């Protein structure tokens, strides 16, 4: 619930702000044909800058910066960074520009962390996207680990970490699900 409250403003695409030379856009839909991914960005800040891109209905050029909101604190692994980099690649593809950095904002510790979008991170995201598509093509459900934070995640009902502790075949999964319904 707390994460939902945190995202209420960030997830509302109708709330747009302009303060001085910064336009803030929320809940922007993005996709990448290159990665085969799509998603919704929490916040994109467009800063007036000659190195930026033109925006329809706005004078000058605007440099986009993504701000991804997280309820908790920085993780010991790269999952938040990978998400931000994937979002960046999607936005770059749509706008036809290069984005050098983005931000992760961690609510519980009130920390806005600048993340450089490096070529190594871009390669990692491309590799992970490729692996994801391979799982899909092979009709496999990847294993997921259950952590106490899983219940706070907006994707817990899709990921189902308690049920997917090992890689499984989709056809077998559906068969087992239907089989258990037949016994009711």
Predicted regions and their residues:
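Surface-exposed loop/turn and secondary-structure junction residues enriched for glycine/proline
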Residues: 33, 40, 85, 102, ...
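Cysteine-cluster motifs in flexible loop/terminal segments that predominantly coordinate metals
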Residues: 140-184
